[in-house]
Amino acid sequence: GFSSAEKVILSASIAQQNLFGTGNAMTLQMNTGRINRTIALSFTNPYWSIDGVSMGWDIYQRNVDPTSLSVATYKSSSIGAGVRFGYPIAEDDRINFGLSVDQTTIKVYDTSPAPYISFVNTFGDTARSLVATAGWGRDRRDSFLYPTSGVYQRASVEVATPVLDMRYARASYQHQHWFPFGGGHALMLNGDVGYAHGYDGKELPFYKNFYAGGIGSVRGYQQSTLGPRYTDSSGYVRSLGGNRRAIANAEYYFPMPGGGKDK
């Protein structure tokens, strides 16, 4: 594949949706791009309990190198594993909970901003976290792939518990509303807010910052270029990200002539 940020992306996956006839699902996925490189193994038992609770686990290894973007220079390598549970509370609503352990190794450079270098000097180049997550989602759109009406909402909370090195909380909420105009035309209004902060005397890890700009947040800007900036020692202006974000936008979708449902 190809994206404006990642450029050429190579990906491969092996998925079994009915593992050994049990109804369980297992997926091995590998992605490699200019910024993100990930290998992940996931397992899901959608019928873990008679009450409709699903259970799954994930193991992953992820490398992040945002130096090709206009983002402050650093690299990170993460390895982790976690367990998750999901429960449908209504026809269109679902809640989920999870607990995972993560170890992230960070590399900073002479051109990295002072807060990044200070973070590594204070906490070391390896950060370990025991992360608890909770989320809620509601999808009342008329189509998952080609929506023209309905509402999509999601909220999530992520807390690095005081068991290991990092201690932070991160929350986000997104709301999308689709208005149909007939003939496949639709107006989509989107709002997205997020807030994060360290606690118990610990800083928010800079690699947990929010960014804005680019497809998926604010079109017309390069990826992750909005927000606080700094000029590095080489004279390049780069984005720092921040602990809060608020985005509101509107998008108009219409069928491409001769493209069927493509918009």
Where is each model-derived feature located?
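Short secondary-structure junctions and interdomain/linker hinges
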Residues: I89-D92, N96, S143, P162-V163, ...
